[in-house]
Amino acid sequence: MERTELLKPRTLADLIRILHELFAGDEVNVEEVQAVLEAYESNPAEWALYAKFDQYRYTRNLVDQGNGKFNLMILCWGEGHGSSIHDHTDSHCFLKLLQGNLKETLFDWPDKKSNEMIKKSERTLRENQCAYINDSIGLHRVENVSHTEPAVSLHLYSPPFDTCHAFDQRTGHKNKVTMTFHSKFGIRTPFTTSGSLENN
């Protein structure tokens, strides 16, 4: 879908409406989606409803299901919380910082031998900055390294997925994990005792 003029979302609801338009077809224009996410100025009054924290781990909070084409969610990172090294199950992954800072570390895919994984790059994402990754780029880990400030990020995955692989940095060994939502549409999901691992 060609855009002669990029639409600037004024609100989170506006952003969601534009994303539905961008994902109406079968093709994903990565640059266009990223530009729209970057154009949205974070406003806590708009996303606070979805920002549900947990004392012990970061949380995944579903905002919109994108008519089956994408999942839009808000991840809440308490002080010192981080993800495992993980893949994205052949999906597009867009990330936008809404509050605070997050450290993203990229890794190469491990080789067949049992060796320590190779770090490709590392960067700090700040409020309103965006990032993009897919499995052809590599694997990543996302962390809130602050001991005093929480962080909140907006994530879009297309197509949606509910399992991925988590990797051991020391050996490259991978495990398949199931991801759960801490809340859906602002409502806390029922507590489950399953062994699922929340990833982003």
UniProtKB/Swiss-Prot annotation:
Entry EC number(s): 1.13.11.20
Modification comment: The thioether cross-link between Cys-93 and Tyr-157 plays a structural role through stabilizing the Fe(2+) ion, and prevents the production of highly damaging free hydroxyl radicals by holding the oxygen radical via hydroxyl hydrogen.
A GO cellular-component term linked to this record: cytosol
Induction pattern: By increase of sulfur amino acid intake.
Requisite cofactors: Fe cation; Ni(2+); Zn(2+)
InterPro entries registered for this protein in UniProt: CDO_1, RmlC-like_jellyroll, RmlC_Cupin_sf
Residue positions binding Fe cation: 86, 88, 140
Top EC class, one word: oxidoreductase
Keywords for this protein: Dioxygenase, Iron, Metal-binding, Oxidoreductase, Thioether bond
Position(s), cross-link 3'-(S-cysteinyl)-tyrosine (Cys-Tyr): 93-157
Molecular function in Gene Ontology: cysteine dioxygenase activity; ferrous iron binding; nickel cation binding; zinc ion binding
Catalytic activity: L-cysteine + O2 = 3-sulfino-L-alanine + H(+)
Cofactor mode of binding and number, as noted: Binds 1 Fe cation per subunit. Ni(2+) and Zn(2+) can be used to a lesser extent.
GO BP annotations listed: cysteine metabolic process; L-cysteine catabolic process; L-cysteine metabolic process; lactation; response to amino acid; response to azide; response to cAMP; response to ethanol
Pathway: Organosulfur biosynthesis; taurine biosynthesis; hypotaurine from L-cysteine: step 1/2
Pfam family, one: CDO_I
Known tissue expression: Highest levels in liver. Significant expression also in kidney, lung and brain.
Family statement: Belongs to the cysteine dioxygenase family.
PANTHER family, A to Z: CYSTEINE DIOXYGENASE (PTHR12918), CYSTEINE DIOXYGENASE TYPE 1 (PTHR12918:SF1)
Protein function: Catalyzes the oxidation of cysteine to cysteine sulfinic acid with addition of molecular dioxygen.
Record text on subunit structure and interactions: Monomer.
Protein name as it appears in the record: Cysteine dioxygenase type 1
